[in-house]
Amino acid sequence: MRNEVEALPQSEPRFQNEAHALATEMSTLDIDSLQQQLDCSRRLAAENWQRFQHFFSAKKIPALLAYNGQAYKHLKASTLTESDLAFAQQHLWITCFLYGLLRPLDGIVPYRMEHTVKLSLTGGRPISQYWKGRLTDFLIASVKADDGILLHLATEEYEHLFDWKRVQSEVSVVQPLFYVEKDGRLQMQAVWAKSLRGAMTRHVIERRIATPTDLAAFSYEGFAYEPRLGEPAYPHFVRRENVMTL
């Protein structure tokens, strides 16, 4: 299935010019500078130095297949049908620090970028600040052109790409929260939260979810909607784990 997805026609990222400019400056950094900017090991810095050196000649792949974090493992994009991908292309935005916003079939090359990276192009400010003025109006207009509802399934660090208070004031933001209940206490566990975001994204795509209330039917790995908790903008999904003590 992955080969079939890769064979589909690729779209061009909306902010490709900006991404190319950022990648060009990243390619001028040495490995030591990359290690500091990306806050990573020297091995990863060397790997990404190579990536940026060959950025413009590397093979492009659809954005939905380019990431391998916890959320994407549970999204399982390579097994989506062509009609699923067509729906996702119309309704899903992927947030990232190099390309800004991506559609699922936008062609991109592998990279690593952190929101704290500071470049001459960004005026010495974190790259998230560089994007804020470019993406906020675009995202708001995109959501309003659809149904005015934004289902927020990105991790909170990506909110830095936008004037998030403006986004919340101009469109209806629904942000599901995922908790594990142990001994009567609710705990948000990062790995589970990331996994559930990916699984819920797939659920929305496969079932063509159109309204927030339809999310109540979502269940995954023991997580289910808990109507007694949260509020419409923050629906809670809870997994109950029984802990026995002796």
Predicted regions: what is each one?
Residues A77-E231, H236-L246:
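Internal, well-folded beta-alpha domain core
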Residues M1-T79:
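Active-site helix-to-loop segments that bind/position phosphate- or nucleotide-bearing substrates
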